Amino acid sequence: MSNKQITAVRGTTDWFDQAMILFNAISHKIIALSDLYTFQRIKTPVFEHAELFSRNLEHSDIVKKELYQLIDRSERKLALRPEGTASIIRAVNEHKLLDQNPWPLKLYYLEPMFRYERPQKGRMREFYQYGIELVGELDQLDYLQTILFAKKILDTFNFDCVLNINWLGNFASRKCWVEQLNQYFKQYQDQLSELSVSRLDSYGVLRILDDKNESKKDFVRSAPTIDQFISLEEQTQFKQLLEQLDQLGIKYKYNSSLVRGLDYYSELVFEFILANNDQAQSTLIGGGCYQNLIAELTNKPLKAIGFALSIERFISYLDDKTKDSLINQDQKPRYLLINLVPNKELATLNLSQELINHNYQVYYQHKLNKVDKAIKYALRAKFTHLIIMGNDEWSKQTMTIKDLSSQTQQTIKYKEFIK
């Protein structure tokens, strides 16, 4: 039998101590905001039929390079969920949620996702993604509300971000654009990376535009842009949206190279990127509109808009002040309970349960019966207070409570403590 230590799989994380506190604090705040914006939570399975992703994201890196696939005992091709939207819309259609609820349908999720990619700061193979989907007969005010919600999340965690925005047009406009891009980039095939060459003759050609290396090349910067192909009506629509952002006081940057990494986007796409940060993974929230995915999975001519964020990436870019605030916010006292009197073990155990029933965080450590050792244990285990039960406490129905931060203590009647 091998003695080699088994460790976590590369690209995954064990959550504990302060990291777990941060994860919970961020999650709780975002969920609370979701409630304020009247979104309802939805959970979908961790794995789906692989076709759900291969059919709707066939040209994306997610399917080509990053999808975790498996074949089960019944020879079915399955895949670990790489993103949330396709699964959500599959569930919406399967359970007829659009028929049973008023429009727009407003859903959010917070789930683990899986992508086989090189682990780096803010990007893991297993990561927790929060996202929203707004589905129905949408208009520009729905788009604006979605952007405002995303901005509200970022403001809550004191992130200074720049909104990057682009308009990809409808399916017909985008198809013409993709055809022109393919013709254009074939002229420079010898100057493209192997990955970019593999993206030619498909919708994947769009990814050349926002590739971190290719986008620095002059001929890529001079490539045809979508505004040369969208209709006058769409140009007017986008212009109105930008004017409305101005009226709302939302600063933005028009980025004609912004395409996002998923095939189903059309019309509006956007990203909130950390200001004054040139790191590759500095996008904190990304999203956009989509219609073809809705039509493909529900057979309804509707629109949807959504965005997503990674909890891990949020944590990696939080400033120290915000981290400390999140870790210490609403932190309740944690009590270590010890008994110094023989034959009072069951009575102490019963006392611990009574305190827990009154919503106190209490642990009775029955193996400690000396105060100095109990203090050392409590400090190591991050308890804030020590409850000492000696002969006087038992006879007078009191508790001696020691504050471990100030090293002060008081003796108080049990009934007064639980009021």
From Swiss-Prot:
GO terms for cellular component: cytoplasm. It is found in: Cytoplasm. GO terms for biological process: histidyl-tRNA aminoacylation. The keyword Ligase applies. It holds the Pfam family HGTP_anticodon. It catalyses: tRNA(His) + L-histidine + ATP = L-histidyl-tRNA(His) + AMP + diphosphate + H(+). Keywords: Aminoacyl-tRNA synthetase, ATP-binding, Cytoplasm, Ligase, Nucleotide-binding, Protein biosynthesis. InterPro entries: aa-tRNA-synth_II, aa-tRNA-synth_II/BPL/LPL, Anticodon-bd, Anticodon-bd_dom_sf, His-tRNA-ligase, HisRS-like_core, HisRS/HisZ. One of its GO terms (molecular function) is ATP binding. Its EC number is 6.1.1.21. Gene3D superfamilies: Anticodon-binding domain, Bira Bifunctional Protein, Domain 2. Belongs to the class-II aminoacyl-tRNA synthetase family. Homodimer. This is Histidine--tRNA ligase. It comes from Mycoplasmoides gallisepticum (strain R(low / passage 15 / clone 2)). The gene is hisS.
